[in-house]
Every structure is written in C-alpha cells, then in structure tokens.
C-alpha cells in the first residue's frame, strides 16, 4: 500500500506522517517513509537528524546507480520505520517531480520499492503542480492534513482537485482528512458537507504535538517517558487502523474556488446566534456587565 500525504505548508504534515508511520509499524507492518521536500526534514522526528538525501547521494556517485547501496540512502528510524529523503533541486531551478521520480527509480533499482507493506510519501506543502503531484502517480490513497481554518481548508480543496484529476488515469482514492491540532471542527464539518469525504481523525490542540517536532521525537517516543501522552498516540493508531482496513475512499468533487471562498468566509462573517454565544469569552462578558 502506498499513501501520499498533502496539506497546507506548516500545517504539520511531517509530524503527522511520522506518527502515522510509527502507528502502522506498531500494527506489525514494514513501513518506509519518503520525504518529498527540498528541506529534507520529513523524517527528522523518526531519526533525530537530517539524513542525506537521494539527490546528494546520487551526485556524490556521479549518478551511477549501480554504485549506490540500500544503506547509502535508507536509514532506520524509531520503531523500525525506514526513512528516505528525496531532497530537491537547487532553489529556483529544476523540478521537484523529477526528484521524486529519480527516488522511486533508485529504490526500484535497489529492489527496495516493493519490500514494504506500506510506503508513505510526505509531500511538500500544498503545491499541486504537475511536479509535486508526482507522488499521486504511485499512491493508492491520499490523506490531506488540515486544521479548522480558512487557509488550510482552501488548500485542501485544491489538493482534492488534484486527486480527482489523477484518479482519471490512476487507481487513486482520497482516504480522507486529518484535522491537526484543533480545538474545534465546525469549519471542517462545513467543508466536508459541501465536498463529501471522510474525516479520519481530529487531533487535539495540545502543545506536545508541536514540541515533539522541536525535540526530534515522535509522540510515541515521548510517551515512553510521559504516559499522559498515550491517549494522543491512540489517535494515530486509529488512523492507521482505518488505512489498513483498505477503505473504499472517494474521488472528491472539489468546490469551485469562488463558491468555497463564499462558504468559508460566510462562516466567519455571518455566524449563527449559537456560534456568536460560543465566541463570547469571560473577559468580554465582564465588559458587558453594568
């Protein structure tokens, strides 16, 4: 099974991807996570350091694939998850899609691409140009990471459009949305009502998820010394269980941009009476007292 993870830049794709990879490994699966970002930091919380990229390794070998060994590019991460970083072209030059293609080509040359139960592509930001949409060519499922905000859901809608386009020629389906670090899901629910798709999970708004990235650890590793985090790990295990059940998935029909803009902005500009009441804080009530 191959999964491509997309979402708005900075939404927490890599942190979420790493924890999903660990959850899949905890379910007894052999997992490979491939970082598809020029920053090459996708697998940082799994390995604890920035591993060399495929492109760096190929350049050092003058692109002689026969001189590259699996241990040159595949690094063992926490929980037994194998890690690869594709890297990227120089800034302002080249194509990220080419880099992804070269990565898959090399892994096939090394007979590694088909050795895993699950391969997870963690893809750069919300860029859905032909280049960075390349992982969708190999994926069985796409997962979109979002939060309960306007920008993230707008990006999710554009990614959904890419999934629909790729599904014309590939056996690709959208597994669903994952809400990351959000205390509410009302705007998410409003979006999936307009663009039907599963919501796999909504992760709680806790600081430890963000801090784990800085520490270079997954929530599962942090939970070894902080038992209070075990309940957070259960969220990722639930996502893993849903993925491993081979869900039917959907081919989404994205909402037209102007219609979505109106839908999401109206949610903020014209909230219902109950929503207005919920937004009143104790401090604002103090000012209203006579």
Swiss-Prot record:
[4Fe-4S] cluster binds at residues 95, 129. Keywords: 4Fe-4S, ATP-binding, Chlorophyll biosynthesis, Chloroplast, Iron, Iron-sulfur, Magnesium, Metal-binding, Nucleotide-binding, Oxidoreductase, Photosynthesis, Plastid. One of its GO terms (molecular function) is oxidoreductase activity, acting on the CH-CH group of donors, iron-sulfur protein as acceptor. Its cofactor is [4Fe-4S] cluster. The keyword Zinc does not apply. Binds 1 [4Fe-4S] cluster per dimer. Gene3D superfamilies: P-loop containing nucleotide triphosphate hydrolases. The keyword NADP does not apply. ATP binds at residues 10-15, 39, 180-181. It catalyses: chlorophyllide a + oxidized 2[4Fe-4S]-[ferredoxin] + 2 ADP + 2 phosphate = protochlorophyllide a + reduced 2[4Fe-4S]-[ferredoxin] + 2 ATP + 2 H2O. Mg(2+) binds at residue 14. GO terms for biological process: light-independent chlorophyll biosynthetic process; photosynthesis, dark reaction. Its main location: plastid. It comes from the Eukaryota. Pathway: Porphyrin-containing compound metabolism; chlorophyll biosynthesis (light-independent). Its EC number is 1.3.7.7. It holds the Pfam family Fer4_NifH. Component of the dark-operative protochlorophyllide reductase (DPOR) that uses Mg-ATP and reduced ferredoxin to reduce ring D of protochlorophyllide (Pchlide) to form chlorophyllide a (Chlide). This reaction is light-independent. The L component serves as a unique electron donor to the NB-component of the complex, and binds Mg-ATP. Homodimer. Protochlorophyllide reductase is composed of three subunits; ChlL, ChlN and ChlB. Belongs to the NifH/BchL/ChlL family. This is Light-independent protochlorophyllide reductase iron-sulfur ATP-binding protein. It comes from Chaetosphaeridium globosum (Charophycean green alga). The lineage of its organism: Eukaryota, Viridiplantae, Streptophyta, Coleochaetophyceae, Coleochaetales. The gene is chlL-A.
């Amino acid at each position: 099974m191959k999964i491509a993870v997309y979402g708005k830049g900075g939404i927490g794709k890599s942190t979420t991807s790493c924890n999903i990879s660990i959850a899949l490994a905890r379910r007894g699966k052999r997992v490979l996570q491939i970082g598809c970002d020029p920053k090459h930091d996708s697998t940082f919380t799994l390995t604890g350091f920035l591993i060399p990229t495929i492109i760096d390794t190929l350049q050092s070998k003058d692109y002689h694939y026969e001189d590259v060994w699996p241990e040159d590019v595949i690094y063992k991460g926490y929980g037994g998850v194998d890690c690869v970083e594709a890297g990227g072209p120089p800034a302002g030059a080249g194509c990220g899609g080419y880099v992804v293609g070269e990565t898959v080509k090399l892994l096939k040359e090394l007979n590694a691409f088909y050795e895993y139960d699950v391969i997870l592509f963690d893809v750069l930001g919300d860029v859905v140009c032909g280049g960075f949409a390349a992982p969708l060519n190999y994926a069985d499922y796409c997962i979109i990471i979002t939060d309960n905000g306007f920008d993230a859901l707008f990006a999710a809608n554009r990614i959904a459009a890419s999934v629909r386009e790729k599904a014309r020629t590939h056996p690709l389906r959208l597994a669903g949305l994952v809400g990351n670090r959000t205390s509410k899901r009302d705007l998410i629910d409003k979006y999936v009502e307009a663009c039907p798709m599963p919501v796999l999970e909504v992760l709680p708004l806790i600081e430890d998820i963000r801090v784990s990235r800085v520490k270079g650890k997954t929530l599962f590793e942090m939970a070894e010394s902080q038992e209070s985090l075990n309940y957070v790990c259960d969220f990722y295990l639930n996502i893993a269980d849903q993925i491993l059940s081979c869900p039917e998935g959907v081919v989404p029909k994205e909402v037209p941009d102007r219609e979505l803009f109106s839908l999401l902005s109206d949610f903020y500009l014209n909230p219902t009476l109950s929503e207005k009441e919920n937004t009143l804080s104790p401090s604002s009530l103090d000012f209203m007292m006579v």
